[in-house]
């Protein structure tokens, strides 16, 4: 049907002048609504489609592409306040590459998703500050570089608009701080290099974050957006199947209300980011004035922005010692070398995921029932061959051919259900697209460790002897875990074996991660109660190092009832292990140090933006006083309220909420000011006071402990429970007893091991005086 020019006036006051196809606008035309909104441009069978210009009575204006009645393609929106967005749109929302100039002269240049900054982008503040890096849902998240107008620069990781993870802070005077941050504050170990001292190479950091070795920013391809260039890109298309009538032109879904330009702006929840505070600069950059031939450097430990420990060293000493931190990666990931190496280790990971997905999918439809004796037998196995090209029962995959064996599947299904683990969630955690992360082994076993992407599960390779012990103890283990919901013993959720094409067999066990928490674990200890060889060399201690018995410089004071519940369960668990002739187990202890709440108002940024600010990202300088010498309370126990708890328990927790003597023997929650409200359970979220043992630090080491008492949140569990007191251990005991005191070595008779273990922990967690 041919188009013809016409002019139509509708009963509601709308006016259209232009080409029609039948009764529908088609071709070029102009449409005016009674409230002053005007569209002029292309139409397609009654829909605004093609190129056009849309003007609001408020003064807002859009010029660019439309599709099916929506802003869709590339175009420029000018708001009444003077802000201008030029870039990609999808269904009335900024989506794709675009540049926004805010009314206060801030500029964002980069990727958008669903109306918010998301992906790579550059944000320049009117005061000269600038950020280049990754964004997520409108906030700085991932890798990025922030430079301040005063010359300071931070190069590292971000989360929700805050410095979070490893990074390097460069001061304007030339000093550097290499360390870790948590929610915008220094948190954990780090090293400060005053100006003039020799520091680690920054080239890798510079290349990772998009600026050259001199520190000059290198703009990415999207630093300047040209609409003509963008129009050559393939626009996002969407099926528009809705039929439109002439009266349909007046519907609100197609008219773009007068306040559209404001409602589509990003939310006003950005954070301010100033350079390092004056208190921090007085500690760090003030020392950068040291410029002798052998300047000192400072090893430091922070607790939510509060400096708690410092060790003074020379830069020469630092250059000859192992790096204490792995700063070129996110803090959560650390690689280790396996016997398979490279791609074979990757294949092993893929095989593990394929096998677990197959096993869980096969066992889940089986009707629930109690376990039987036959479920523990040698015949209780699921076996399957996984050829690369797939089979009648298995999908094709990109790994190598392998044989899969799953041990006692019904037993482990019931164990997972005992801990309320949904089968679908379990598979998604381990077998999801995000995959597994390999983590460094904390011990001497040579095992490979994997961590699920959500940190809920740890997967460890087993020796053949360990597998045999686990299968022998499994009936008793199942009974013990069922009888004692508060048990601290490692939670096992699956045991598997992979046989590779050249005959190599690799055995795995899936366990709950005892440190599955949003809180940062500042210290980790592996405590056995023995002393022979139970220390870590100072130059090998890093951010993620698991320390040992002789490294423990604290004793922990707990609420009376919490302590009673703890040792009641420890004694029960040790009796169970003793009855199985198990030794070499240890208490894995994780500590989260709390900075006192009153300090949060006088520490480093962040500071929230005031309501008067625009939707641009704020940037202010914060003047902070120096750190106080005595920290007030950093946590608080209150009566348990189930609906008020912020976080769900990890997969290793099944027990009830604990009662505290100090709260009237009621069930309790733990409040961490400004962070969370947590349910207190045995081994999880347990509050305590860590008392530093005087004289523990060697004066010659130059280490200064700034406080004597800290509030801590404690996480713990009993691990490494698969070593029997066999002939090999008896021989080890005999040989070492000739050289050392028999009670100081690890390999002793299980009854003595259990008693020594408990006695040692009674000293670590003493009764309050």
Swiss-Prot record:
Task: Tell me which domain of life the UniProt entry assigns to the organism this sequence originates from.
Answer: Eukaryota
Q: Where is this region: Activation loop?
A: 725-746
List each copy of the PIPK domain by range: 344-765
* Residue pairs linked by disulfide bridges in the UniProt entry: none
Q: What is its EC number?
A: 2.7.1.68
Q: Name one GO molecular function term.
A: 1-phosphatidylinositol-4-phosphate 5-kinase activity
Q: Region labeled Disordered — which residues?
A: 266-289
Instruction: State the organism named in the record.
Output: Arabidopsis thaliana (Mouse-ear cress)
ATP-binding in keyword set: yes
Its protein name is Phosphatidylinositol 4-phosphate 5-kinase 8
Q: Which GO terms describe its biological process?
A: phosphatidylinositol metabolic process
- Per the record, where are the segments of Polar residues compositional bias? 276-288
Q: Which PANTHER family match?
A: PHOSPHATIDYLINOSITOL 4-PHOSPHATE 5-KINASE 8, PHOSPHATIDYLINOSITOL-4-PHOSPHATE 5-KINASE
MORN repeat locations: 16-38, 39-61, 62-84, 85-107, 108-130, 131-153, 154-176, 177-198
Q: Which Pfam families match?
A: MORN (PF02493), PIP5K (PF01504)
Cellular component GO terms, alphabetically? membrane
Reactions catalysed, as given in the entry = a 1,2-diacyl-sn-glycero-3-phospho-(1D-myo-inositol 4-phosphate) + ATP = a 1,2-diacyl-sn-glycero-3-phospho-(1D-myo-inositol-4,5-bisphosphate) + ADP + H(+)
Keyword list (alphabetical) reads:
ATP-binding, Kinase, Nucleotide-binding, Repeat, Transferase
